[in-house]
């Protein structure tokens, strides 16, 4: 997990690399450290190891080096996931989603096996002003999920479709 709250969810290791973490991005050292963490988890004999990444897996803008997702890139290289579940926002542009899918499908040998559509609208200004996120109506989410699934050929989940998502993950790893 990349968040301290990961321990609340049973994470075996925490590598904070989000906003204000203080972890500098020294790629080689980061990759070695995370790879050692992965090994310490692997020797416990789990069938599946879940890894969470910070948002913005690819940059929205190249106008500021602070927007480059270098830590996320290093973490992907260090963990080499077999499968990805890409979480997207309702308002994310389809070309951005497509770039993210292409990136994840090419950086390591893994592939995007599912998309999870976040059911709240949070614009940047509202986030800065600490406003509550707004629920997106289920029929709008459903239509967007169908559209994304059709466009990308990847199952799309939203709301409480956790059992279907788990089934997709299990089927992927049973192949």
Where are these regions (language model features)?
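Flexible phosphate-sensing "switch/lid" loops adjacent to ATP/NTP-binding sites
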Residues: 1-175
